Amino acid sequence: GFVIPYGDCPLDQDMLGERVYMDILNRARKYVHIMTPYLILDGETETALKFAAERGVEVVLLLPGIPDKEVPYALAKTHYPSLLASGIQIYEYTPGFVHAKVFVSDDREAVVGTINLDYRSLYHHFECATYLYKAGCIPQIEDDFQATLAKCRQVTKETVRRESFKVKMTGYLMKAIAPLM
């Protein structure tokens, strides 16, 4: 297999972190499992996630159930209704704050690094990650994802409906400035 470290720089136009994530989403056949502390999506990334699920790929998002920052937490929840409607499974980690940034797909490829699934990481920050293709450690990355998933609660349409008014309003009001977050 291959293990390829890479860096992403906001000073060029390459957007390597986003391209790697989009490539994994677009080529997935069986599953894409994603663990990220922040979920503030642009239209292109949200469309890629939804398209993967709609073509039969199991897309699972694992996010914090306990936030470190209220506004990004509320913003993430604004995406839940449309993601759930497309068949994406969303889980929230209940024991604490999950800070891992992991993509793993089809027992074939994975990314582990510093790149969150949000505007700041994808467009504004210096980030780094490691892309793994057919590397021997990919099953262990998936095992870790599954072990973490076992400590999560699943988000449903009912969960979204019962979310507090404060969280809903915070998320939708802040959506206008989401690209800055």
Feature roles, as predicted:
Residues 1-181:
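Charged, low-complexity intrinsically disordered terminal segments
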